[in-house]
C-alpha cells in the first residue's frame, strides 16, 4: 500500500466522550489521502472499542496503539514513530475542522516551490471558536513565511493556531521522555524554528472547542504547577541558552521566561526534587539572574494562593 500524504495523529486519554466528533470530522474531509493514527495513553474508558468499530467501517486507514500513561510527550513520540505519511497533523481528541481543512493544507503546501520546500517544516492556519470567531491574531499577509519565534516574539502574533509538520523533521526533534510530568510543545516548536520556516496562512482550518473539564484542568494549583515544573524549567533553560538574543526585541516576554525558570525551580525544590535543569550559557544565566526577583515573587504568589485555597 502506498504511503499517504497525511498522517492525522490523535493522542487520547479517557476521551471516548469527545472522540466521535473527531472521527466524524475526519471522515468528512474532502481530501482523502490520509491515515488516522490514534495513540491511547493509558485510557480506562471505552476508547479501544470505539476506535475498533470505526476502523471496521471507515473507508480510510485507522491504526490504534495503546500504551501505559506517559503524558502527551510519549504519545506524540509514539505517533511520530508509527506514522507513514509525509506530513504529520496532530488533531487533538476534542476538536473538529472544516471539511476542506486537509485540502487547504495540501494546496498551501504544494504552492511552495519544490526547490524551496526543504527549508519549510509545514503550514499553519487559523482557528475559530464554536461561534465562528477567529481565535487570536490574523497574519499580516497570507501567505506569511516565518517561524514560531519570529512570528510570536518578533511580530507579536498570538492566539490558537493549527498546522502540520513534515514527518522527517519531527523525527529529528523528539520530546524528551526523561522529563517527569508534562512537557510543553513550545520546546519542540522553538527548536524547529531555529532551523526551518513555516508557511502561515489566513485560512480557517480548525474549530476550537472548550470542554468543561478542560476549564477545570486549566485552573492553576500548586500541585498542578509542580506536576509541570520540570518541563517548565527544561524548556525555559533551552530558550535562555539558544534564544536569548530575542531579549532585545521582546524584553518583557523573555524576562517572563527567565523568571519562570526560577519560579518552577523553587517548585521542584519544595517538592523534594534535586533536578533543576539550569541554563548552560553565560547569557542564559545572566537573564535568569536579571529576572530572579520576579521569579521569586511569582513562586511566593503561588504559595500564598495555595494557602488561600
Where in this protein do the model-derived segments appear?
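A conserved acidic beta->alpha catalytic loop
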Residues: 25, 40-49, 92
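Glycine-rich, basic loop-to-helix element that forms the pyrophosphate-binding segment
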Residues: 67-83
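Conserved nucleotide-sugar donor-binding catalytic segment
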Residues: 129, 133-219
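Conserved donor NDP-sugar-binding/catalytic core segment of glycosyltransferases
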Residues: 100-137
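Catalytic core of nucleotide-sugar-dependent glycosyltransferases
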Residues: 205-212, 218-246, 271-274
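Short, well-formed alpha-helical segments that are part of the catalytic scaffolds
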Residues: 14-28
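Short beta-strand/loop segment that forms part of the nucleotide-sugar
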Residues: 33-42, 63-68
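Short aromatic/hydrophobic "clamp" motif used to bind/position activated sugar donors
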Residues: 88
Amino acid at each position: 500500500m502506498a504511503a499517504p500524504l497525511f498522517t492525522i495523529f490523535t493522542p487520547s486519554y479517557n476521551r471516548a466522550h469527545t472522540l466521535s466528533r473527531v472521527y466524524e470530522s475526519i471522515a468528512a474531509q474532502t481530501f482523502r489521502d490520509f491515515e488516522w493514527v490514534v495513540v491511547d495513553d493509558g485510557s480506562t474508558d471505552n476508547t479501544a472499542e470505539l476506535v475498533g468499530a470505526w476502523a471496521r467501517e471507515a473507508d480510510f486507514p485507522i491504526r490504534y496503539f495503546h500504551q501505559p500513561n506517559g503524558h502527551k510527550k510519549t504519545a506524540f513520540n509514539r505517533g511520530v514513530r508509527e506514522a507513514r505519511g509525509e506530513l504529520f497533523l496532530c488533531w487533538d481528541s476534542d476538536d473538529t475542522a472544516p471539511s476542506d481543512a486537509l485540502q487547504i493544507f495540501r494546496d498551501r503546501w504544494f504552492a511552495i516551490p519544490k526547490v524551496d520546500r526543504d527549508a519549510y517544516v509545514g503550514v499553519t492556519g487559523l482557528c475559530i471558536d464554536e461561534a465562528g470567531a477567529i481565535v487570536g491574531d490574523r497574519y499580516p499577509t497570507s501567505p506569511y513565511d516565518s517561524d514560531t519565534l519570529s512570528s510570536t516574539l518578533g511580530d507579536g502574533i498570538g492566539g490558537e493556531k493549527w498546522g502540520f509538520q513534515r514527518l522527517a523533521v519531527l523525527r529529528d526533534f523528539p520530546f524528551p521522555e526523561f522529563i517527569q510530568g508534562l512537557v510543553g510543545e513550545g520546546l519542540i516548536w522553538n527548536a524547529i524554528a531555529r532551523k526551518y520556516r513555516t508557511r502561515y496562512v489566513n485560512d480557517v482550518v480548525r474549530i476550537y472547542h472548550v470542554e468543561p473539564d478542560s476549564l477545570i484542568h486549566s485552573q492553576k494549583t500548586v500541585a498542578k504547577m509542580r506536576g509541570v515544573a520540570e518541563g517548565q524549567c527544561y524548556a525555559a533553560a533551552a530558550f535562555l541558552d539558544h534564544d536569548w538574543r530575542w531579549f532585545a526585541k521582546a524584553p518583557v516576554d523573555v524576562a517572563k521566561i527567565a523568571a519562570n525558570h526560577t519560579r518552577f525551580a523553587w517548585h521542584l525544590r519544595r517538592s523534594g526534587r534535586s533536578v533543576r535543569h539550569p541554563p548552560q550559557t553565560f547569557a542564559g544565566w545572566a537573564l535568569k539572574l536579571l529576572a530572579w526577583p520576579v521569579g521569586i515573587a511569582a513562586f511566593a504568589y503561588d504559595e500564598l494562593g495555595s494557602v488561600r485555597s
